Amino acid sequence: MRGRCYASTMSQPASQVSATLEHYLALRAEIERHNRAYYELDAPEIPDDEYDRLVRELRALEAAHPEWVAENSPAQTVGGAPSSAFLPVEHPTPMTSLDNVFSDEELAEWQEKLARALNLPPDHDGFTYTGELKIDGLSVNLYYADGVLQWAATRGNGRVGEMVTEQVLTIPGIPRALPGLTGELEVRGEVYLSRADFAAFNARAEELGLPLLKNPRNGAAGALRQKDPEVTRTRHLKALFYSLGKHDGVPVRTQGEVLAWLAEQGFPTSRYSETFTGLQAAADYHRRMTAQRAQFEFDADGTVLKLDSLALQAEAGSTSRAPRWAVAYKFPVEEVETVLESITVNVGRTGKLAPLAHLSPRLIEGSTVSKATLHNEDYIRDLDLRIGDTVVVRKSGGVIPQIMRVVLEKRPPDAAPYRFPTHCPECGHEVVRAEGDANTYCPNPACPAQQFERLRYFVSRGAMDVRGVGEKLIEQLLATGLVHDAADLYQLTAEQLASLERSGEKKAANILAQLEASKTRPLWRLINALGINHVGERNAQALARAFGTLDALLAATPESIEAVPGLGRTIAQSVSAALADPSMQDLIRRLRERGLKPVEETAPRGDALAGLSFVLTGTLSRPRDEIKARLESAGARVTGSVTKKTSYLIAGEEAGSKLDRARELGIPVLDEAGLGALLEERGV
């Protein structure tokens, strides 16, 4: 959560900043633009530390010139406008932000202000605090009435948020009901995308040629704002809860008791929270967390220190934007200088040229960094990167190494501008770059690098799943000329395979058996294996369900492909162009000649389940998306929550609160076998 936390004016006298009204208004406009990018578009344009610097300057100007301050100043407000794509919901108690401090000295100044607010001497140091991590995610508020969850909403502007109930309920560990509670209850927490899930998503997106997430916070915000909660579910969001708004009848007196009560009710809470007394203990906690930040499963950009006593919190009160009894102590942005030793350019299966920076190894946030992605030619040119340059590197979002800038005063006198390849580094073919496209491609389908990557993808587990055909074998097959593309795999003989290095008759027989078995894989696997840009497992399954047979897909128009749920124009154009390409048509023809007969999908009747509403829960043997698409293609509606209007609950292993809710309402519950029987009965 950038939070958004607002920077304190501590340690920045107003005299140090320009004091013209014109500058003030320009600064306000710039911060408002960044707020829209961050809150409403989930597309921040600058790092958090740069944003914090701008807000510190604005607040210093407003402190020096209170006559300039308007009620809607970004230094006086919280968050951004709720999205019009979701229903607005008003928080019973406002979700305020936090002030920031950046040093022990600023922390001491903040405590002095707190003491004055409580009519205590400024040097009072007997406060007991609870320390927590400041997770870089998306704040949410869960509202319960008489123990039953009514809605979940984002922070929004602090007063009004976006209702995201079904999306939030895809997150593990969120209770639908809290037995025994009466009155109103608000539970606040942070939704996040773990570093591991962020890396896995980007690796998959890069493989499919899709846009990458900039950082885990963007990933969490984008996933939570998906209109379809089943899409949210596939992003594997998590949440940690840390505070209460209204809390009728909840017997808590301290923040420590709040965290303990939340854990008792089943809410996920952080294991990094601690309670301590005094300023030195607070600073020590912050230093310990700073040292451990590389080990967290999520991104965190600081610690939060809260007065432990809820009574003292109420007495200290809040400003219009932040409580006086809590503060965010930001982690330092860890940047290191290193040397750009070289730039290599790799070629992917689509022919895309991907430049990679090789750096002198340096330790950043607990791990050694020696490489950084350079994205494309424009990225290199905009930074004016040159071999031998000293560059500043940070981990973007705490995960991906990123070159931020060049230290020009350390540039070697003989450093020359980097020239992006005009010819493919693998095959020597002249490269191409379409107008308006940031990426450069090798158009040669016979490029060895592309051949290797296409074959590796074809046999991978998510495609044709040919076990035993790994990278080393593919390299040998290409080097010996036995194979040039996927169709050639199905002409290999036992003798040819046995003659290869580290092979033999037994291994050859196993590989041939695997290849034979792959000839009758489901249609979606073949579609995925063809390596069409923007088509991975999910989209391949959607295409297979929509068209049923390979011939039907090959005959499909761009308009009919675009009509497939979840695809859209860009993917439809990519699929149409790929299937119309003569080399792709030749590959498919030769695959069929060599025995590939993918198992066809049976197209269901479009109205067989019309009027029925289904909910899926628990662990199922097939992907939820696959089951959902099959139901919807037959006219059913699939939702994320059980209501009186639900026709059937489909329950897998470890079904939780949805199963309990269905039983309470008398909703029919089917296991997968029962669903299969229903579909067979309806002709689906």
UniProtKB/Swiss-Prot annotation:
Enzyme class (EC, first level): ligase
Catalytic reactions on record: NAD(+) + (deoxyribonucleotide)n-3'-hydroxyl + 5'-phospho-(deoxyribonucleotide)m = (deoxyribonucleotide)n+m + AMP + beta-nicotinamide D-nucleotide
GO MF, one example: metal ion binding
Cofactors named for this entry: Mg(2+); Mn(2+)
Binding residue positions for Zn(2+): 424, 427, 442, 447
Assigned GO CC terms: cytosol
InterPro entries linked: BRCT_dom (IPR001357), BRCT_dom_sf (IPR036420), DisA/LigA_HHH (IPR041663), DNA_ligase (IPR001679), DNAligase_adenylation (IPR013839), DNAligase_N (IPR013840), Hlx-hairpin-Hlx_DNA-bd_motif (IPR003583), NA-bd_OB-fold (IPR012340)
Pfam families from the UniProt entry: BRCT, DNA_ligase_aden, DNA_ligase_OB, DNA_ligase_ZBD, HHH_2, HHH_5, Nlig-Ia
Gene3D superfamilies found in the cross-reference section: 5' to 3' exonuclease, C-terminal subdomain, 6.20.10.30, BRCT domain, DNA ligase/mRNA capping enzyme, Helix hairpin bin, Nucleic acid-binding proteins
Keywords: DNA damage, DNA repair, DNA replication, Ligase, Magnesium, Manganese, Metal-binding, NAD, Zinc
Gene Ontology BP annotations: DNA repair; DNA replication
Binding site for NAD(+): 48-52, 97-98, 132, 155, 190, 306, 330
All residue ranges annotated as the BRCT domain in the record: 604-684
Signal peptide, first to last residue: none
Function: DNA ligase that catalyzes the formation of phosphodiester linkages between 5'-phosphoryl and 3'-hydroxyl groups in double-stranded DNA using NAD as a coenzyme and as the energy source for the reaction. It is essential for DNA replication and repair of damaged DNA.
Family affiliation: Belongs to the NAD-dependent DNA ligase family. LigA subfamily.
NCBIfam families in the cross-refs: dnlj (TIGR00575), PRK07956.1 (NF005932)
The protein, known as: DNA ligase
Naturally occurring in which organism (per UniProt): Deinococcus geothermalis (strain DSM 11300 / CIP 105573 / AG-3a)
Taxonomic classification: Bacteria, Thermotogati, Deinococcota, Deinococci, Deinococcales
